[in-house]
Amino acid sequence: MCIRDRGYSVRNLKYMSKFASTYPDEQFVQTVSAQIPWSHNVAILDKVKGEKQREWYIRKTAENGWSHNVLIHQIESGLYERQAIADKISNFESRLASPQSELAVQTMKDPYIFDFIPFKEDMVERDIEQALVQDVTKLLLELGTGFAFLGNQYHLNVGGDDFYIDLLFYNLNLRCYVVIELKTGEFKPEYAGQLNFYLSAVDGILKKDNDNPSIGLLLCKSKNALVAEYALKDMSKPIGVSEYKVTSELPEALSKQLPSVEDIQKHIKRD
């Protein structure tokens, strides 16, 4: 019988052969790769080199329910390099109990890719903040699973004085508030002190008894790693420092290959 009579194209058979040689462990196939659709497995075979990387993307796809286009976006934006093996700067391990500290580190990325923000030379923090809020669907996709957006310029009244947080989230996996502050320039030590204060205020005003300690994330255009490490060393609250990139800073080939706004929004609505 012709192989096409059985519904298998030559291309599909080649992928099946490649799949079998790539994953010789039958138990891995049954318990891990079988959790995601065949088209997703094909995308990972095509685009991901290395056993650890492939397994990581398979597990993340199953965990997050990524569509085919979103999976490709995550691969081409280098999510494994930015989240799984990045040299992240934070004081989470010394300020949070286990396993909360490990989960917080795993959740963090460096850099964050805001490919939906058109770069302008005269952009200030508020411009970036507004652009992120306007496309909150894509912002949540980049931040990762479990994030719920609570507001921007979130007002806190502390002893009669007014303070405003750039972006406030609650993470359902971490079970804590996440305060994000945006900076258009290089990291400065005083930014950590300001965020430390905001976290104290959030813990005092918003945090409930069953919530974990709030976490802060400083997103800067650039950072001196050693300066950031020293700045966080004596901060009392858990804080991470990451860089971010916008559209004009991405390689042209990558920018062309990213999924459309419609693709991402359809995926989020479907979930």
Describe each region flagged by the PLM.
Residues R4-D271:
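Basic, low-complexity intrinsically disordered segments
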